[in-house]
Amino acid sequence: MQLHYSNTDIGGETIKDDDTYLIKDNRALNNLVVSSTRLYRGKQTRGHRHPGQEEVYVFVQGFGKMIVGNEDSKPFNVGPGSVVLIPDGEFHRVINDGDSNMLFNCVFGGMRNH
């Protein structure tokens, strides 16, 4: 089992590949999933929640905004080096309003429930 990756290529399998984003999940560990999302310029993730699941976002490339809390929460800026903690069940969305694609990695426990 490979244990070391770069922050721009976490390995794993493609979960979604469409005109909004490319998502890959690495399920090499028993209790955590590491997911990588390339969010294309001008696009946004669908806002969602994970009841019973916390999540950590680590932004690697590109600039944009993120909303955490509820759909009406004020967006805040994110970019390379930003780390965002998503509490259990909190609404969250990433918005790429920058001039290039964004890349961010997420870590969450258990299985993907979204």
Model-derived regions: residue spans:
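Conserved short histidine dyad/triad with adjacent acidic residue
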Residues: 35-51
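A short, N-terminal "cap"/entry segment at the start of jelly-roll beta-barrel domains
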Residues: 1-33, 46
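Conserved hydrophobic/aromatic beta-strand scaffold that supports enzyme active sites
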Residues: 34-38, 56, 75, 83-85, ...
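Short strand-connecting beta-turns/loops that link adjacent beta-strands
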Residues: 28, 52, 71, 99-100
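A short beta-strand-loop-beta hairpin characteristic of the jelly-roll/cupin
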Residues: 54-80
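Residue-level recognition of conserved beta-strand positions in structured domain cores
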Residues: 36, 49, 60, 68-70, ...
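Short beta-strand His + acidic residue motifs that chelate non-heme Fe in jelly-roll/DSBH
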Residues: 46-47, 66-67, 75, 86, ...
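Ligand-binding loop in jelly-roll beta-barrel domains
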Residues: 79-80, 88-114
